Each structure stands twice: as C-alpha cells, then as structure tokens.
A protein has these predicted regions:
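Active-site-proximal alpha-helical scaffold in enzymes
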Residues: 77-90, 142-145, 150-153, 159-194, ...
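Phosphate/pyrophosphate-binding loops at sites that engage ATP/ADP/AMP, CoA/4′-phosphopantetheine
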Residues: 84-99, 250-257, 286-303, 326-330
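A glycine- and small-aliphatic-rich helix-loop capping segment at beta-alpha/alpha-beta transitions
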Residues: 21-28, 112-129, 179-182, 202-215, ...
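Condensing-enzyme catalytic core mediating Claisen C-C bond formation in acyl metabolism
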Residues: 4-8, 31, 35-36, 218-294, ...
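Short glycine/threonine-rich loop-to-helix capping motif typified by GTGT followed
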Residues: 271-280, 309-326, 346-353, 383-386
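Glycine-/small-residue-rich "gating" segment that lines the acyl/pantetheine channel
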Residues: 126-133, 174, 178, 195-252, ...
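ACP-dependent fatty acid/polyketide chain-elongation machinery
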Residues: 1-66, 88, 248-260, 356-371, ...
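Conserved beta-ketoacyl condensing-enzyme motif
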Residues: 7, 22, 28-164, 193-202, ...
Length: 417
C-alpha cells in the first residue's frame, strides 16, 4: 500500500502576522505586512521598503549570549517549528528514541544565514575581529539551519537544508514527502525560512533592477502582482513550518489532519540565470507533473496559489503557464491569488508561505486576495481574486513556485477535512 503524506501541524512567522491565528486573519482579510525598513538605515538607497517581521522577540528563542553566533533566520525557524509541533500535539523531546530516529528535519532556504555572514564580513573589513562570532564559518554555511532545529528538538532523523532559490521550501517539502513515501521516515519537520533583509542583499537586488523603487512613501502598495503598473518585487522574510506525517501514523495517534500533500512536479528550463523563457512551457510542465502524481485533472483544481512576484516578466509568463497547464478555458474559471502582494517575497521560504495560506483557505473556505491589482494588464487576464477575498470550498489546490536559474516547482494539496 502506498504511504500517504499529510500535514498535521503548522507554525508561522510572517510580516503580516506572527503565529498562525494572526497570519490567518491578515492573509484572508488582505492586510499587508510591507513597511519601511527598520533593520538598517535605508535612507541613502533607492529601496526603503520590505516585508519585514515586526513585534518579534528574537531573544525569546535564542539566549542573549548566543544571539551574536546565529542568524536572524534561526529564531524565525525555531518559533514557527515550535508552533508546528505544538499544533500537531507533539512533545518532540519526550518521544522515545526510536520515534525520534524516524523524525527528520528538512527545511528550505534561499539565503540561510546570509545576513549573518554579511555582518561578519563587515566586522572583518572594519578591523573589528574581536566582535566576530567564533562560529562565523559553521553558522554561515547553509546546512547549519536544519542542524540547529534537530538539536533544539532532539530529532535524530535525516537533517537537510534544500536550497534551490525561490523553490527551496517547495522542494524541501517534496523531499520530505519522498522520505515518508519510501518508508525512511514517519514524520518530518519541514517548510521554509529566510531572512534576507540586509543592506548587501537589498543593494544586490537593486543592481539587478528587479525591486520596486516607486513606493517608498506608500509601502503597502509596493507589491503589485499582475497589475499593469508593477515594476518589481519587495523583499520579504519569515518562516512557515509544518509537521509532515505518514497518513496511517497520524490516524493512529488521533492527529488532526490539515491537508494531504499528494503531488509534486519540478522542471528546469535550462535557459537563463534569471530570466524566464516567454513560452511558459516548463512552469506548466511542473504543474502538470504535480497534478499527474496527485491523480487529478484540470477540472479538479479549485484554487491556485501563485508565485506572483510583481515583476513584469514573471507575472506574464506565470499566467501563460497556467493556461497551458489547465487549458485556457479552465484557467479562466479557477480562482488564483498571490500572497506576495501582502508579504513581499521571502525568497526560499515563499513556497511554504503559499502552502500555509492555502491550508488556511481550505480550513476557512475563504480565498486570500491579491492586493494592489489596480490596473488590468491584458496579458494577465485570469481571476486573481483582486482586492478582497471570497468564499470558496477547496478540494484540491496547486501551489506554484518559480526560481532564478530556470527552476519551476509545484505541489498539489488535497483537502481531507
């Protein structure tokens, strides 16, 4: 019998809400978490807004003496993971050893500890070696993030970080699904976390010309997916974590099942370091592969959570890809929305963010809206649920992601509630 994978716990640290209840209220009502940057002085640069997590106490999750040795992404991930385990009804450190050996940690992150590493270089080049962390190398490598979570929760299963750009957390959840399907693990702490709001990263994106520079005085209007006047994305941050569990295992312990992860597809266009190919064929094929594994057709898709970055190229081609994947007639019938309009772009964590929003949409039978879609683009002509959410029962949903380097990944969620 095929082993099925279900989500039994969820935790959130988001620019528009810390904790799942706060995130649910904000995302379903359409409240923006984009604000002026407070992490550093942005007054001298062209972009001064970000989807920044506010009212978050890092020292509630990392001791004061340890804070200089870790990145901001770690307290995000610890907070979201703790909530995910709690809502799943799991006291991880109290589990028997054999169960902890079958409990893995697989997290996606695009930048990991990049802001920590940037600070270490700043200290080094300013001759402040005494202020540098003794752990500048181990903390700075990508793989440290999953290890920190494994140590905190005493989980002895596979501990991996997946980093594939913006598809990182989608791919991490798929890898976790494969580990459970194959029988190697019974449950996995999985999802995504990123904290890329630093001067160096923001300046790098400015050099690429892919951030919006028009909305410093009205931050909440800056992320404008599918609107004709969109001119770039807004950097975001946060963590969205889940407990992924084998279905029979979850049933046996009486767990509440939030959704089934039933399909995954991933492709690469092999085209360009940053740009998408205009045809949209490979993003469409990734969606098709996910639907194929889930055993569903276009007529079964009730909602699509879009990548929707607010760049001219991405939004146009993602629209084209959905028409190819679902057929143009069906694509026009299926409601879709872009969470990045509310929170900005949290890089490798964005797939997990979209999955969290989709689960909440299933639970509440309420679609999250796409904000700031003020000017219709004739090349982006699908139903993006503009301005306000709407009631909708969701049986199956597609969660789509597109990354630098021509990567495309999609997951299908099934509502078992």
């Amino acid at each position: 019998m095929k082993r099925r994978c279900v989500i039994t716990g969820m935790g959130v640290v988001s620019p528009n809400g810390v904790g799942t209840p706060a995130f649910a209220d904000a995302s379903l009502e359409g409240r923006s978490g984009v604000r002026r940057i407070s992490r550093f002085d942005s007054s001298a640069i062209e972009v001064q807004i970000a989807g920044e997590v506010s009212d978050f106490d890092e020292l509630a999750w990392v001791e004061k003496k340890e804070r200089k040795h870790v990145s901001r992404v770690l307290p995000f991930a610890l907070c979201a993971s703790s909530e995910a385990l709690e809502t799943a009804g799991i006291q991880a450190t109290s589990l028997p050893l054999e169960e902890r050996r079958r409990f893995g940690v697989i997290i996606g992150s695009g930048g990991g500890s990049s802001e920590f590493t940037e600070e270490q270089y700043r200290l080094y080049f300013h001759g402040q070696l005494s202020k540098m962390s003794l752990f500048c190398v181990p903390t700075g490598v990508m793989g440290s993030l999953s290890s920190e979570l494994s140590v905190r929760f005493s989980l002895r299963g596979a501990s991996h970080v997946i980093t594939s750009g913006c598809t990182s957390s989608t791919d991490a959840m798929a890898y976790a699904m494969r580990q459970i399907e194959s029988g190697r693990l019974d449950w996995v702490l999985t999802g995504g976390a990123d904290a890329p709001i630093s001067l160096g990263t923001v300046k790098g994106f400015i050099l690429m010309g892919i951030l919006t520079e028009k909305w410093n005085q009205a931050p909440e209007k800056g992320s404008r997916p599918f609107s004709k006047d969109r001119d770039g994305f807004v950097v975001g941050e946060g963590a969205w974590m889940f407990v992924l569990e084998e279905y029979e295992h979850a049933k046996a312990r009486g767990a509440t099942i939030l959704a089934e992860v039933c399909g995954y597809g991933s492709t690469c266009e092999a085209y360009h370091r940053v740009k998408l190919k205009e045809c949209g064929e490979e993003p469409a094929r990734a969606i098709g592969l996910a639907m194929q594994q889930a055993g569903i057709g276009p007529e079964d898709v009730d909602y699509v959570n879009l990548h929707g970055t607010s760049t001219q190229l991405n939004d146009r081609i993602e629209t084209r890809a959905l028409k190819l994947a679902l057929g143009e007639e069906r694509a026009r019938q299926v409601p879709m929305s872009a969470l990045k309009s509310q929170i900005g772009h949290p890089q490798g964590a964005c797939g997990a963010a979209g999955i969290a929003a989709t689960i909440l949409a299933m639970q509440h039978q309420q679609l999250p809206p796409t904000l700031n879609l003020d000017n219709a683009d004739p090349e982006c002509d699908l139903d993006y649920v503009p301005a306000a959410g709407r009631k909708k029962t969701i049986g199956h949903a597609v969660c789509n992601c597109i990354a630098f380097g021509s990567k495309n990944s999609a997951l299908v969620l099934r509502n078992l509630m």
